[in-house]
Amino acid sequence: MYKVDLNCDLGESFGSYKLGLDEEVISYISSANIACGFHAADPLVMDYTVKLAKAAGVSVGAHPGFPDLVGFGRRNMNVSPKEAKAMVQYQIGALDSFCRAQGIKMQHVKPHGALYNMAGKDLKLAEAICEGIYEVNPELILLALSGSEMINAAQNIGLKVAREAFADRAYEEDGSLVARTKEGAMITDEEVAIKRVIKMIKENKVTSITGKDIPIKVDSICVHGDGAKALEFVKKIKLSLEEENIEIIPLHKIY
């Protein structure tokens, strides 16, 4: 039987600003990536989201990003590997405090936005992030783009790593995500997105934006919890995977 994790970015509200459908989406996923206060969230949101995940039996991971609330962590920043490592450790520590307060263990770490994309192509940056995670807790699992430099960096130091694919994003021929600013970057047709995910899991292939099939290995599928159709899409993808005899389980049960 095929097995896969279904993850979603949660806890992205801030103060009086509400983002996402966290309370609804959490029933359909197996792992939650919780923002840690740099690109989104605040202490109350972090505390609430950890409690929400615990109540739903969903595994918790830190979702560290660049300190850029206005840009939602999606703008590139010129940081040294040393800075990136410290940023990641700082944010893991913040979320881990709320996990400890609730008596649960943090499962994984998934960098956010620009930090995720930059580290996917920059080995030095990827190495710094992986070292930061490993030093804090060598049992944590890195969740990173399949085929990226982050996968290589984690494997080089013995950090557990799960390969992630995106249900609603287009891929370049080199396996990287098509930039959101580029036409065709988002897969908006739900049926197409679901078929792509099933193909990734069962055939280890994905059709790139040029139409060429490229190899891909997948341990976890990312779905998004914001947007008008988010909830219905998450429901459909979970049901479709189950109909294909693909078991949805959290990362720590895969590793």
UniProtKB/Swiss-Prot annotation:
The highest taxon in the source lineage is: Bacteria
The protein's UniProt keywords, in alphabetical order, are: ATP-binding, Hydrolase, Nucleotide-binding
What is the gene called?
pxpA
Name assigned to this protein: 5-oxoprolinase subunit A
One biological process GO term for this chain?
carbohydrate metabolic process
Gene Ontology MF: a single term? ATP binding
Q: Which reaction does it catalyse?
A: 5-oxo-L-proline + ATP + 2 H2O = L-glutamate + ADP + phosphate + H(+)
Gene source species:
Clostridium beijerinckii (strain ATCC 51743 / NCIMB 8052)
Q: Subunit structure, per the record? A: Forms a complex composed of PxpA, PxpB and PxpC.
The EC number of this protein is 3.5.2.9
Q: Which InterPro entries match?
A: Glyco_hydro/deAcase_b/a-brl (IPR011330), LamB/YcsF/PxpA-like (IPR005501)
The reply to whether Transport figures as a keyword in the UniProt entry is no
**What family is this?**
Belongs to the LamB/PxpA family.
Nucleotide-binding: present as a keyword of the record?
A: yes
Signal peptide range equals none
The protein's job, in short, is:
Catalyzes the cleavage of 5-oxoproline to form L-glutamate coupled to the hydrolysis of ATP to ADP and inorganic phosphate.
